[in-house]
Amino acid sequence: MRGAGGPRGPRGPAKMLLLLALACASPFPEEVPGPGAVGGGTGGARPLNVALVFSGPAYAAEAARLGPAVAAAVRSPGLDVRPVALVLNGSDPRSLVLQLCDLLSGLRVHGVVFEDDSRAPAVAPILDFLSAQTSLPIVAVHGGAALVLTPKEKGSTFLQLGSSTEQQLQVIFEVLEEYDWTSFVAVTTRAPGHRAFLSYIEVLTDGSLVGWEHRGALTLDPGAGEAVLGAQLRSVSAQIRLLFCAREEAEPVFRAAEEAGLTGPGYVWFMVGPQLAGGGGSGVPGEPLLLPGGSPLPAGLFAVRSAGWRDDLARRVAAGVAVVARGAQALLRDYGFLPELGHDCRTQNRTHRGESLHRYFMNITWDNRDYSFNEDGFLVNPSLVVISLTRDRTWEVVGSWEQQTLRLKYPLWSRYGRFLQPVDDTQHLTVATLEERPFVIVEPADPISGTCIRDSVPCRSQLNRTHSPPPDAPRPEKRCCKGFCIDILKRLAHTIGFSYDLYLVTNGKHGKKIDGVWNGMIGEVFYQRADMAIGSLTINEERSEIVDFSVPFVETGISVMVARSNGTVSPSAFLEPYSPAVWVMMFVMCLTVVAVTVFIFEYLSPVGYNRSLATGKRPGGSTFTIGKSIWLLWALVFNNSVPVENPRGTTSKIMVLVWAFFAVIFLASYTANLAAFMIQEEYVDTVSGLSDRKFQRPQEQYPPLKFGTVPNGSTEKNIRSNYPDMHSYMVRYNQPRVEEALTQLKAGKLDAFIYDAAVLNYMARKDEGCKLVTIGSGKVFATTGYGIALHKGSRWKRPIDLALLQFLGDDEIEMLERLWLSGICHNDKIEVMSSKLDIDNMAGVFYMLLVAMGLSLLVFAWEHLVYWRLRHCLGPTHRMDFLLAFSRGMYSCCSAEAAPPPAKPPPPPQPLPSPAYPAARPPPGPAPFVPRERAAADRWRRAKGTGPPGGAAIADGFHRYYGPIEPQGLGLGEARAAPRGAAGRPLSPPTTQPPQKPPPSYFAIVREQEPTEPPAGAFPGFPSPPAPPAAAAAAVGPPLCRLAFEDESPPAPSRWPRSDPESQPLLGGGAGGPSAGAPTAPPPRRAAPPPCAYLDLEPSPSDSEDSESLGGASLGGLEPWWFADFPYPYAERLGPPPGRYWSVDKLGGWRAGSWDYLPPRGGPAWHCRHCASLELLPPPRHLSCSHDGLDGGWWAPPPPPWAAGPPPRRRARCGCPRPHPHRPRASHRAPAAAPHHHRHRRAAGGWDFPPPAPTSRSLEDLSSCPRAAPTRRLTGPSRHARRCPHAAHWGPPLPTASHRRHRGGDLGTRRGSAHFSSLESEV
C-alpha cells in the first residue's frame, strides 16, 4: 500500500480498500457493559483493539498474516484481543506524524505496537508525543524507536522493548573490563544523541576503580572526505574504538578507517545505538552484512542488542501486544470497564488522564519474562546479547546480559578460524605462562557470571592444533589468572600498546630439553606457538641460547627452606636476661654494700642511730638497723609493697634514692628481655651453601638429611651441572610441585627443600603458623633473575626492556613486590605475641620454689635437732655467756621496736569504789639480787622441764627472737638450789604459785656496766641487802639487769579488781624484817592479768605548777597513787616505751619492796606509804616514779608502827582517790586504754586530778636524786613505799590480789617485750 503525503490520508481505490478491510475486521468495540461484567462479544469477553503499525516497505508481505498469529499468541482472561496491522510508507517525520494521526482518528483502538526498519532517530520523539497527547499506550519493539533523544513527555505511556544507549555502554564496558581493555577512544558524528553518548562515557569512567584510560573523543564530519577522516582516526592511538553515528554515516567512517589500516584484527570496534546492529542481512552465516552504500562491515565489529533480536516478527510484535493486554486487564479488574481514550491528535491534551493510567503498564510479566519499565520507558532488567561480526561477515552471539550479569564465551576474540588457528595480527600477542604462586595464580571463573574478578584476566588451557576438534567439541575452559607477573603483563600491554591472549602450558614446566625436545614455556616460545612467555622463568645460559630474555625484573637465585623445630625452655630461662656475673654483682656486691653504706650513714647521722643514743631520746636502740636497710633495698628492687622503715638522715636518703633509680633500670631491663627467654627456643638448621657438608655428605649424619627440589627447572639444572653426587642423592626426594614439597616439610618427611629464592621467600612469609623459614634469613646462592622469554630477534624485545626499566625506575616493580611478595612471617623475627606460656616456660621458677622449700625443711629439721638434742650435750662452761651475749647483740642490730602511735586526748578520770581488804599475810624472806652471769650459767646446767608450770610458755616469746637460747637467770621462779652470786648474796628462792597461763608477751635481758666503785647498797639512797663478804664485795660489784613488760594480749573483761599485797612489789632495801603484826593471807588466783611496772622519773609540768603555786614547798596534799586495773582510759599514755627497765631479780631482791612489809591495817603509817609516785594504768600497765616526787622528798619515811611518839611530818605526796560507794561496780567498768600518768590533789570534799604528764627515767636517776636533808635518808623497813588507800575507805590489801611478779604470783614468769640498748650492754 502506498500512502499519500497529504493531510487527508489515502485517496482513491487504496482508501476504499483500507476502509473495507477495517470494516471486515470490525475494529470498533461493542457497547461497553457496566462494571463487573465479564466477557463480551460472542464469548462474553471485552474486545481489546490493538493497532500494529509498521513503518517501511519491508513489512508489507508479513503484515496481513500477523493479526491471527498475534491474537493466538496473546490470550488474556476477560479480553478478546483484536490486533489490526497497518503499514506506513512515509519515512520522514512529517509524513509519519500525519499518517498516525489520521489512523488514530478513524479507529477506536486501546493501544499501539510500533516497529520500523528505517532507523530514523526522530521516530521515538514522535511516538512519545502522540502517547502524551492521546493517553494511548504505545510500545516500540524494534528499530529507531529504541532511542529517546529528549526527556519523556509528561503523562506519556511510550514504552520500549529495546535497549538504551546507556544500557549498551554498560554492557560494553563490562566486556572491556573482562579482557583488560582499558584504553579506548570514543568516535562519534553529530548524529542526534551524540552528546548523551559522550556524557554516559564520562559517568561510567569517572570514579571507577578499573583505571580506564579514555584517550579522547573524535567528532567526525562524514562529508569531509576519506583523507580527512583517516587523519583524524590516526591521530589517536587506541585499539579499542567506540562508534556512535547514524547508519548512513557509518559507511564513510569505516571506509576511511580501512584506508588508514585501523580495521584489521589488531583493532576492536564497538557499535553503539540501534542504527547498525543487525542491518543489512538476516544474520544467517554466509549472508554478508552490507552498509547502505554496499560496503561490507569490518570483521571484529561488536554490538549490543536485545535478546530477541533474532526472533521473527510475529514474536516480537506479540511481546508488545502482551504488554498492552496485561495493562488493559489490570484496568478492567480495577474499573470494570475499559476507559475511552483519545483518538484525535488535534483534541485537547489528556496528560492528566494519562498519568493515572500510566502505572497499569509499568510492571508486566509475560511468557516467564519480566517487562518492568523505568521512568524513561525502558526495561529495568533487559535481556541483552553481545554480538560479534566474524570473518564470514555474520553475526555471532559471544555473550549475554541477564539480571545485571555478563556471561561471555571464551575466547571472545574473533581470531580463530574453523580449526582454532589464530589470524595474523601484528599488535596481538599470544602469551604462555605457568601457574606458580605468587607470580601466576590461577582461579576458576565466577560460576554465576562466568567472568573474572577485578585485577585478574581471562586465561585458558593450551590449544591442541595438531588434530581438528569435532564440531561439537566444547570451547577451551575459561580460567582467571592474576599475580605479580600478570600485573607486569598488564602494564606492558598498556605501555607498549598490544593485546594478548593468555594461556597455560599443559605440561606445567618452565622448560627443559628432554631427548632433544624442549618442553614448558621455553618450548612454547622456541617452537613459536607463543609470542611471549612470562612467569617465574629463570634466566640461565642454556635457555638464553634458543630464546631471547628481557632484562630481569625480579632478583632470585637458589635458596633452602626448612621447617622450624620446636625446642625446649631451659629451667634457668628466668635468669638468662642477665649473665651470672650481673646477678652476683647485684645481690652479693651491690645490695650488701649499699645496705651497709646506708646503715653507716644513718648511724653517723645527727638525727639517726648515734644521735638517739647520745641524747637518750631512744634509749632502747635505733629503729633503723642493718636488717631493715637490706629489707628496704630488697623491696625497692622488686617493687614489693611490704612495710619498710625509711632512714632519717639526709645522706642515707640520697643513697636510697639513687638505689631506687638503679632498681628501676635493673627491673625494667629484666622484664623487657624476659619474654624473649621464656619462649620455646626453635631450632633451625644453618648451611653455608650448596657445597655444605650436610648436602655433600648427607649419609654421615644421623639421621641422614633428606632434601630435594622440583625437577625440570633451573635449580635442578644448576645442581646437576655442579654437584652430580648431590643430584643423584636428592632425586629420590624430588617433589612434583612446590605446594607438595611444603607439605612434606611440615610433616617431617623432608628436611630441606631447594628451590628458587623468590618463591621460597614468598612461601615462608605466607605460611600459616610461620613454621617454614629460609636458611640464613633468605640467603641466596647462584644469584640470577626472572625474565620474559621472546623469539630470537623479536621486535618486541627492545620495547619490553625499555618498559621494564621504566617500571624499575618508577618503583612500580617495588610496589608490586610489596603487594604480592610480602607476608606476615619474617625469618629474622618470630612473632610470639599470641603464644601462651605453659608449664615448660615457667619450669625454672617452680624449680627455684621447690629448692627453697627443701632448704627450709632442712633448716627446720636442724633447728629442732639443736633444740631438742644437741643443746643438752653442751658441758657447763662460761663460754655460753659470750655466745648468748653475741647472739643478742647481733639480734639488736637487725631488729628494733616500732614507734608507738600518736597520743590521743585523755578522757576524764572515773572514781573507784572502795574494796574490802582482808588481812595480809607475812612477807617472805629477802631475796638478794642475782648476778647475770651466774643466772645464765645456772640455767644452762639445769635439766629440761625443771621449772614450774608455765615456764615453757613464758620462754616462747623469748624463743621468738633468740631461737633455742634459754632465758637464764631471769627470776622465772624455777625450783633450784641457791648458789652464791658473785657478790656473795644468795639467789631468790622460788615462789610457789598455782600454774597460770602467761599472757602472750616477750622479754629480753642484757647486762649493764658495773659501777667502778660499789656503793653501800644496790643504789645510793636505797637500803642495802645483807652485807656479803668483804673480799667478794670488793671484787665484784652488783650487776644490773633491765626488764620491761608490755601486755600484748587483749585486756580481760572489765571488772573491779582485787588487790593483793604480794602482787605489788615495791622498791626498797635493807635487812629489815616484816612487821610482827602484818596479817598474812594466801594469794588467790587472779582471773585478769596484773599491770606492768616501770619507773617514771621525768619532771611533770603539773608537778612544776604545783610547786610554784606553793612557793617551792612540799605539796603535802598532792599524793600520787596507783591501783591495779584502774579503768582510766587515757589515750595519751600511749607514748614511747620507757628507756630504763629493771629485772625481776632487781625488783624482787629488795625484800622491803614486798607487800608483806605493809603495816597492819589502821596503823599510824598505813595512810600513805609509797616508795615512789605510783599510779594505776590500764593495759599496758606500768609502775612509775616521778622526778617531782624525788625533789619533794616523797621517800621521807614515816615512823614504824612500833615506834613511840607522834609521827614526824612527812613530805610525801601520796594518797588515794575517794571512791563512790553508791555507784555499782558495773558503772566503773571501762575498756583498757593507753597507760597514763595520773596525779591528784586532796581537797575538802574529795580529790581533784591534774592533767597527766608521762615521764621516764632510770633507777640510777632515782638513787641519785637530791635529798631534802640528811635525816630523810631511807632506813629501815619504813623506807619502802607502801600502798596507800584512803583512811576512810581503804583497808588492808585484798586477799584475792596476786603478786606483781607474774599473773600467777611471780613477776619473773611474765613475758614482755624487751627495750634495751645494745651499745650500753657488754656484748
UniProtKB/Swiss-Prot annotation:
Motif position, PDZ-binding: 1321-1323
Coiled coil start-end: none
Sites marked Functional determinant of NMDA receptors: 639
Catalysed reaction, written as an equation: Ca(2+)(in) = Ca(2+)(out); Na(+)(in) = Na(+)(out); K(+)(in) = K(+)(out)
Subcellular location: Cell membrane; Postsynaptic cell membrane
Highest taxon, organism lineage: Eukaryota
Entry annotated with the keyword Cell membrane: yes
Biased composition (Basic and acidic residues): 931-940
Family: Belongs to the glutamate-gated ion channel (TC 1.A.10.1) family. NR2D/GRIN2D subfamily.
Main function: Component of N-methyl-D-aspartate (NMDA) receptors (NMDARs) that function as heterotetrameric, ligand-gated cation channels with high calcium permeability and voltage-dependent block by Mg(2+). Participates in synaptic plasticity for learning and memory formation. Channel activation requires binding of the neurotransmitter L-glutamate to the GluN2 subunit, glycine or D-serine binding to the GluN1 subunit, plus membrane depolarization to eliminate channel inhibition by Mg(2+). NMDARs mediate simultaneously the potasium efflux and the influx of calcium and sodium.
Protein name: Glutamate receptor ionotropic, NMDA 2D
Species of origin: Rattus norvegicus (Rat)
